[in-house]
Amino acid sequence: MVDLRIPAALKLGPKLKRSFFARSVHEVAPDLIGATLLVEGSGGVIVEVEAYHHTDPAAHSFGGQTPRNAVMFGPPGVAYVYRSYGIHWCLNVVCEEAGSASAVLIRALVPTDGLALMRRRRGVEDERALCSGPGKLAQALGVTIAHNGLKLDAPPFALHGRLAAPEIVAGPRIGISKAAELPWRYGLRGSKFVSKPFAE
């Protein structure tokens, strides 16, 4: 069955290698729109992300390395997981060379695989509510601190690139008080699965 929620060009592409992440966070972030993220078989197509650079006051790494953010200072292509407001886990991908401490927050995806399990984890039926926000996404995919520092090109993760470049929109990031004006949130144009619509 054709999934009309996702352009055909965004169907499962080649597996992303570490070199994909060893680039500027501002290149990696929009390039992740349309990629497919699976965690032990559950997941879907990424439709919203945010970039965080080490020179960015909103980045966890801005004040220097701590036990909590140490993974950000490591090699690219690994998961950086933290708890937001002491409640929700959030999944990020570390970018650029080791020591640069930049990452992309995965904010939303279109659920395509393992929907029954994701619904049980989230306690909701509406597929648009399963992964439309970083906390929801991590809960749906079963991501916890146990995934912190794990390589994204090896189980339990599977991350595949898109087959063609989609239409991408950009705007200010959400829920931050510092550098809130920077247009470092990226999304798939017209997607109903993002956490908040983009102003166009």
UniProtKB/Swiss-Prot annotation:
Keywords of the record: DNA damage, DNA repair, Hydrolase
NCBIfam families: 3mg, PRK00802.1-3
A biological process from GO: base-excision repair
Organism: Rhodopseudomonas palustris (strain BisB18)
The family this protein is said to belong to: Belongs to the DNA glycosylase MPG family.
EC number: 3.2.2.-
Top-level taxon in the UniProt lineage: Bacteria
Example of a GO MF term: alkylbase DNA N-glycosylase activity
HAMAP family: 3MGH
Pfam families, A to Z: Pur_DNA_glyco (PF02245)
Name assigned to this protein: Putative 3-methyladenine DNA glycosylase
